Amino acid sequence: MPKERLTEELLERLLASSTPEAYLDEGLTIDRRLPDYLFQLLGEKGMKRSEVVRASGLNSTFVYDVFNGDSRLGRDKAIMLALGMGCTLRETQRLLRLDGVSELWAKNRRDAVIIWCVEHGYSRTQTDDELYRLGEKTLLGTGPLR
């Protein structure tokens, strides 16, 4: 699989194009679906779906439906799945985008904690512990609410 170009690089090329068609004719856009990306990540990380289910804390039937394209995750479950797969921050942001939800934003207190946890390789349970410790809603929806 060819290396995917960074969004920033593509944006520069689009803005430098004389017309939208000139950019589109370069064939740089992709039409990727979430299930395709999830299977790509599984292969890259050498994981099985059952391992992702255990590590993410999500319902197995639901996870299998997401991988089949029959269900959408929603933001917190997408983050849980990314943590369960050991995703990098870039992979997590891409997973969130492909699910159609907002990316993690460093200006948001809760998101900042999650970003830090992803960057430091925390598991889903470790991330929930950190969120709880700092008074934020956990990914499982429990914990102190301000």
Please give the residue ranges for each predicted region.
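The alpha-helix within a helix-turn-helix
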Residues: 42, 53, 82
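Long, compositionally biased
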Residues: 83-85, 110-138
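Short alpha-helical "recognition helix" segments of helix-turn-helix
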Residues: 48-55
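Key DNA-contact positions within bacterial/archaeal DNA-binding proteins
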Residues: 50, 61, 90
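Short, basic-rich loop-to-helix N-cap that marks the start of a DNA-contacting helix
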Residues: 70-83
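A short, Lys/Arg-rich alpha-helix, primarily the initiator
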Residues: 16-48, 125-144
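Recognition helix of helix-turn-helix/homeodomain-like DNA-binding domains
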Residues: 57-73, 98-100
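Short, charged recognition helix plus adjacent turn
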Residues: 2-5, 11, 93-122, 141-143
